[in-house]
């Protein structure tokens, strides 16, 4: 009797092991089915970089418009946004959740160099296309990543062009830079130095700051004592606010010049208490009140579909960064696959909507080096200083 009980227990145990072995972790969906295509984006909806969070919400407007118009080849876009608080560790967590639980087909946007670098290799390893990172680190595209397609002009290119404008148009020779101590700021620093070298000039001050710093008194004093006539800012919105307010308190009034990352004038004007007036920035797209037919279309759609959102640079940047994936999906047709989308993306040439012209090939995934230059006028108005301008020193185009 005891032998039979032991045999029964053994049989049950073996059966249980076999059952567990057959219940392998479910593979994530392929990213699409007959009715939908799943696309994701991370972005800071909270935290020090929250003003940049509207980028991800702007992409949602684009996909809402696409779905309203019938979708793409019979499929609608199902879009997922996750808040990573501009924290690379959080980015890793939310991206893995989207890939492994939701089954994302592709990512668009994604604010920040450090957050993007934290997931770049993971996305490539999982063969997931990533279009239009909302960052411009040269390490995103050099060496080439077959799954990553950049829309944003490199920080190095932008800083190069802005420095040229300072020297040649503003006729200023004493230039300083306050930069975030990560890839975002360091790439810009390289671009500034590269351009200054052509004039046999050097920076009078180069000051790194950490993304989480809240006191810039010593840094501002160093800038003031350097005699800088113009200061480039490659920092996050919170740091920019603190810098300008601290500078105003000590009577330091250089010509501030900043990245397109701080080109949402109504926002920056408001949070600086009006101190943003007169600041010059790069711009990756047209002014928000542009009469460009597509800008008018999306601006009207925003009023109708997302009245709670403020139409501005960061918000429409989400459209600009995500639009190429829509174009590629249209080209592919009904027979959707990752390989087909990659082929379509690699064939995009001189494609332009509300931003610069984009061209990608199998050997080059940096889409552009062009930007506009604008100035914040009274009451946060936009003053166009320079149309599309490319970096004549860009080395990536020569490869």
Regions found by a protein language model. Give the residues of each.
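Solvent-exposed, acidic/polar segments of extracytosolic/periplasmic ligand-binding ectodomains
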Residues: 26, 35-37, 293, 346-399
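Extracellular/periplasmic periplasmic-binding protein-like sensory domains
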Residues: 244-319, 389-396
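Short, charged, surface-exposed loops that flank catalytic or proteolytic processing sites
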Residues: 330-343
